[in-house]
């Protein structure tokens, strides 16, 4: 393009930005200088994209030994869980390490839906092992546990709560160098191979909380679609719901230039920064894949095409939400999982009650997006259309209802439990669920619409039944 043409394009873009509608209901412009939030705090003016290197391909796990050899690794920790330790993904990884002469030790005591206690057990193992590299083979629980182990083994004098997000922890920035970590995801949901977030149940308060820092993200993610063929149908579905909500929430988070406070130093800019032009691309692309392939992936265990696309969608959504963030569906999901009573999800071989993360997230989605659509309704309507809604005659003020109805149909078609009541909760549990949501300000403050305790209670009540 000639210089004159480039200058003309730049001029036109500036004019469009200056003329952009400033109404918060109809505008989502990113061309904002620092300003003030409603609380009076200075808002941010920049966003930063951080993502792990990723390698995709059927059978790519067999390269992990060569990668570690190239890194000069001499003492590797391979983390997984007891169920997966008996399955092909772990065996393929171990065979590659053996073939390439990499000494390694297996830690297979990862807990599905980890707790602070299970994190600390893995951390102690890592500290004693003095490992110079890590391999995490598993779902989000394994990858999150491995990230935490790597962090605290690299910072052995730190207190456990030092890096845990506020208000429960101190939320200190990570300034120590970590060891290389290669993530091999075996589910299509969390996107942890691309993010610097490790989530766990803090049992003392019965809430989920996390460690969030770009510094802890895996060095490399090996996305091998062959690993998806071992997943039972409900694991595929619940993992896919996590992808769905990652995409929807990151696309509808508060824009980065409206988030406060503005950091005084780049190291304190949070991993979750609000929606931005780059995260938007990944979120929308992931959502289109979910709309096209999730039902196929659930219904046909041999549909490698559908399961391969969902494996990529997990990473794509991870890149999006790993930088933009999520909001109410995830913030409210943590007490839903953490306060579980007796519910045990189908297809999960665990010895404790379990509401899988993806299920806990999606059960509130119709209520949440009805609530948030007052802000940026055009984005809510756009996502409803991607998921199959006919929006040609829809009114912009009905965007939340349209998206909620579209989600209900999508979930009904995939045999999702009929709301929180179906997984063991009642109206009597709402105060505890609200209390468990309040510490999740790391994500809830990114919701496009502020929420009171009364709002949260109403959202939980509306989520007791879906259909």
Curated annotation (Swiss-Prot):
> Sites of the modification Phosphoserine?
452
Q: Name one GO biological process term.
A: glutamate catabolic process via 2-hydroxyglutarate
Cited InterPro entries: ADH_Fe/GldA, ADH_Fe_C, Alcohol_dehydrogenase_Fe, HOT
Pfam families found in the cross-reference section: ADH_Fe_C, Fe-ADH
Regions annotated as coiled coil: none
Whether Transcription regulation counts among this entry's keywords is no
Q: Which SUPFAM superfamilies match?
A: Dehydroquinate synthase-like (SSF56796)
**A GO MF label:** hydroxyacid-oxoacid transhydrogenase activity
Q: Provide the leader sequence positions.
A: none
- Localization, UniProt: Mitochondrion
The reply to whether Oxidoreductase figures as a keyword in the UniProt entry is yes
Catalytic activity, as annotated: (S)-3-hydroxybutanoate + 2-oxoglutarate = (R)-2-hydroxyglutarate + acetoacetate; 4-hydroxybutanoate + 2-oxoglutarate = (R)-2-hydroxyglutarate + succinate semialdehyde
Q: Which keywords annotate this record?
A: Acetylation, Lipid metabolism, Mitochondrion, Oxidoreductase, Phosphoprotein, Transit peptide
Q: What does this protein do?
A: Catalyzes the cofactor-independent reversible oxidation of gamma-hydroxybutyrate (GHB) to succinic semialdehyde (SSA) coupled to reduction of 2-ketoglutarate (2-KG) to D-2-hydroxyglutarate (D-2-HG). L-3-hydroxybutyrate (L-3-OHB) is also a substrate for HOT when using 2-KG as hydrogen acceptor, resulting in the formation of D-2-HG.
Would you identify the family this protein belongs to, as annotated?
Belongs to the iron-containing alcohol dehydrogenase family. Hydroxyacid-oxoacid transhydrogenase subfamily.
Give the protein name, as stated in the record. Hydroxyacid-oxoacid transhydrogenase, mitochondrial
Which species? Answer: Pongo abelii (Sumatran orangutan)
């Amino acid at each position: 393009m000639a210089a004159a043409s480039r200058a003309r394009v730049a001029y036109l873009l500036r004019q469009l930005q200056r003329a952009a509608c400033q109404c918060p209901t109809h505008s989502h412009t990113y061309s904002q200088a620092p300003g003030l939030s409603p609380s009076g705090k200075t808002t941010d003016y920049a966003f930063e994209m951080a993502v792990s290197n990723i390698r995709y391909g059927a059978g790519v796990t067999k390269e992990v030994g060569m990668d570690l050899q190239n890194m000069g690794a001499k003492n590797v920790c391979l983390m997984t869980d007891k169920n997966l330790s008996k399955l092909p993904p772990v065996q393929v990884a171990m065979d590659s390490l053996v073939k390439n002469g990499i000494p390694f030790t297996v830690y297979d005591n990862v807990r599905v839906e980890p707790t602070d206690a299970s994190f600390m057990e893995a951390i102690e193992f890592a500290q004693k092992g003095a490992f110079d590299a890590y391999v995490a083979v598993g779902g989000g629980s394994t990858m999150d546990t491995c990230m935490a182990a790597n962090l605290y083994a690299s910072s052995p004098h730190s207190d456990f709560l030092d890096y845990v997000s506020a208000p429960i922890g101190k939320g200190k920035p990570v300034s120590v160098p970590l060891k290389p970590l290669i993530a091999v995801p075996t589910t299509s949901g969390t996107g942890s191979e691309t993010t610097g977030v490790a989530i766990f149940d803090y049992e003392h308060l019965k809430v989920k909380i996390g460690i969030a820092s770009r510094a802890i993200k895996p060095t490399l993610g090996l996305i091998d679609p062959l690993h998806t063929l071992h997943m039972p149908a409900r694991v595929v579905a619940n993992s896919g719901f996590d992808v769905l909500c990652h995409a929807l929430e990151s696309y509808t988070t508060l824009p980065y230039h409206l988030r406060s406070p503005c950091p005084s130093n780049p190291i304190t800019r949070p991993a979750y920064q609000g929606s931005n032009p780059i995260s938007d691309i990944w979120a929308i692309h992931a959502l289109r894949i979910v709309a096209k392939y999730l039902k196929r992936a659930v219904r046909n265990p041999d549909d490698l095409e559908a399961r391969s696309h969902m494996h990529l969608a997990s990473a794509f959504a991870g890149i999006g939400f790993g930088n933009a963030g999520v909001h109410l569906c995830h913030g409210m999901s943590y007490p839903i999982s953490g306060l579980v009573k007796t519910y045990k999800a189908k297809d999960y071989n665990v010895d404790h009650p379990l509401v899988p993360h993806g299920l806990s997230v999606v059960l509130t989605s119709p209520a949440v997006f009805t609530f948030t659509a007052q802000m940026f309704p055009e984005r809510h309507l756009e996502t409803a259309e991607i998921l199959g809604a006919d929006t040609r005659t829809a009114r912009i003020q009905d965007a939340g209802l349209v998206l909620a109805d579209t989600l209900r149909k999508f979930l009904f078609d995939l045999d999702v439990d009929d709301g929180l009541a179906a997984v063991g909760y009642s109206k009597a549990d709402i105060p505890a669920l609200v209390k468990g949501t309040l510490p999740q300000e790391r994500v809830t403050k990114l919701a496009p619409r502020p929420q009171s305790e009364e709002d949260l209670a109403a959202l939980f009540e509306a989520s007791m039944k879906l259909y």
